[in-house]
Amino acid sequence: MEFSPPLQRATLIQRYKRFLADVITPDGRELTLHCPNTGAMTGCATPGDTVWYSTSDNTKRKYPHTWELTQSQSGAFICVNTLWANRLTKEAILNESISELSGYSSLKSEVKYGAEHSRIDFMLQADSRPDCYIEVKSVTLAENEQGYFPDAVTERGQKHLRELMSVAAEGQRAVIFFAVLHSAITRFSPARHIDEKYAQLLSEAQQRGVEILAYKAELSAEGMALKKSLPVTL
């Protein structure tokens, strides 16, 4: 996926009110960007980081600029727009870049399912194969090349794991897919030090037949794509 039109560069002053960030452009203008990420954004929003942003042609938007990527002061690229995790995963599935998810003839998005009234990110179908339910999570928290999810306690994420276990128990295929959107990450684990319950549920889910996949995106200011499978340690 290529960014079109090209992203523009600025330097981060501060992120605040969760949804806003002030930046300064190379020519000295101060802008307020929309921040499409409600998470903690640990390590992704340090003042002085380079920010890459898009600009909407919708004249009715109060904040027409959207923060898409961070380029940290160590040089790592991080996709902070959480919407891209699903978009990149869908693109990779359709391009058959994810070998574990290839060979299906139909892809549906946001399908209602489960006893807890959830919506699955993607459902894959094919003749003579069980349906494949895929829940996507964006991974941007990094420490010494180790990627972690979540970056804050997530009751919603815990619910999704319970739903996937129910799907697997019914004989369908259930997949939790971690889209790693940080160029410095080389391996993945659940963030037990942040959400122990989620880590416990992820281990239980694997034991009950839920598949765990982690794929890393190649990231740059020009574009990004999920390319490489990463090792997962529970």
Swiss-Prot record:
InterPro entries: SfsA (IPR005224), SfsA_C (IPR040452), SfsA_N (IPR041465). One of its GO terms (molecular function) is DNA binding. Keywords: DNA-binding. The keyword Mitochondrion does not apply. Pfam families: SfsA (PF03749), SfsA_N (PF17746). Residues 201-220 bind DNA. It comes from the Bacteria. HAMAP family: SfsA. Belongs to the SfsA family. PANTHER family: SUGAR FERMENTATION STIMULATION PROTEIN A. Binds to DNA non-specifically. Could be a regulatory factor involved in maltose metabolism. NCBIfam families: sfsA. This is Sugar fermentation stimulation protein A.
